Amino acid sequence: MIRISIDAMGGDHGPEVTLPSLLRVAERRPDARFLIFGREDEARPVLDRLPALADVSDFTHCEVAVRMDDKPSQALRNGRWKSSMWKAIEAVKDGEADVCISAGNTGALMAMSKFCLRTMADIERPAIAAIWPTIRGESIVLDVGATIGADAQQLVDFAILGAAMANALFDIERPTVGLLNVGVEEIKGQEEVKEAGRMLREAALETMQYHGFVEGDDIGKGTVDVVVTEGFSGNIALKTAEGTARQIAEYLRAAMSRTLMARIGYIFARDAFQRLREKMDVRRTNGGVFLGLKGIVVKSHGAADEEGFAAAVELGYEMVKSGLLDKTRATLDLYHARRPVAPAGAVSNA
């Protein structure tokens, strides 16, 4: 049984979306059980409309719901112990749940997750990893918003975390890893990126294959299994890709309905267009995994509908089922066992 804690109050639509989506997950994942945290006055009317959900879930009333516009510091101070977001994360810490899912405020969710779960040994900052549809299938891109700016060591940490996720999710023994840069030549890019590349080459880990630098168009090509960058550029890339997918879908809809001949052509090519639409549907890959913590947390888009939130819940399910935490710890242990230790008395230039 996979136990999944749910922040029912998160997102733009709250229980009206988060709760019905769980029935979709239950149908596809019969060994899932849900620990639901939310305000009784808002969640109960929805639960009463979904009697089948009672068989696979337990509900806990929480007095506070973190708002989407709350600052992380406010969310931590203002009754965090009573909030549905905190309680859902705490269930993972206490061993009552295997993974936490929330569509709530990203900054608050990350702050609470770090405070409650803590980071793994030698990981300074967690990263948010997203699944990215590519020409070759799917890849992982991180960080997409947790860390604005990153030094070389943090980029190396992200590479290790991303490789562990690719190993767990895609069952790839040695995922290929690339550092996002303005060019593939070793002389290009910021010093932090170039130094991270040198460190990854020298580490020569058996758990990954360091490919080198990759450019923005390599993400969609699927040149590597894992693309590593800092959160500012990663978030812009993610939002740009999602917006472009919606833009192309809208162009296709307009083109297919413009003339009678276009509508007739669509009838004959309906299956192909349906496959394209499914491939470009951002709901299918909804969910960012918080990597580097001592527990698993998945962030859904705040605007997700039922199918989108269900995809985030199923992503969390897969992360538990595939042994993400154990594989991450093993990869980190291997790296730090090989990492050079500074001589006693050495002075850092940092």
Swiss-Prot record:
Main location as per UniProt: cytoplasm
A matching Pfam family: FA_synthesis
InterPro entries: FA_synthesis, Phospholipid_synth_PlsX-like
GO terms, biological process: fatty acid biosynthetic process; phospholipid biosynthetic process
Keyword Transferase: yes
SUPFAM superfamilies: Isocitrate/Isopropylmalate dehydrogenase-like (SSF53659)
Signal peptide (UniProt feature, chain positions): none
Database matches in Gene3D superfamilies: Isopropylmalate Dehydrogenase
EC numbers on record: 2.3.1.274
Intracellular or extracellular location(s): Cytoplasm
Keyword Cell inner membrane annotated: no
Pathway(s) of this molecule: Lipid metabolism; phospholipid metabolism
UniProt KW keywords: Cytoplasm, Lipid biosynthesis, Lipid metabolism, Phospholipid biosynthesis, Phospholipid metabolism, Transferase
UniProt-recorded Gene Ontology molecular function terms: phosphate:acyl-[acyl carrier protein] acyltransferase activity
GO cellular component: cytoplasm
Domain of life: Bacteria
Subunit structure: Homodimer. Probably interacts with PlsY.
Similarity section: Belongs to the PlsX family.
HAMAP family linked to this entry: PlsX
Protein name from the UniProt record: Phosphate acyltransferase
Source species of the chain: Chelativorans sp. (strain BNC1)
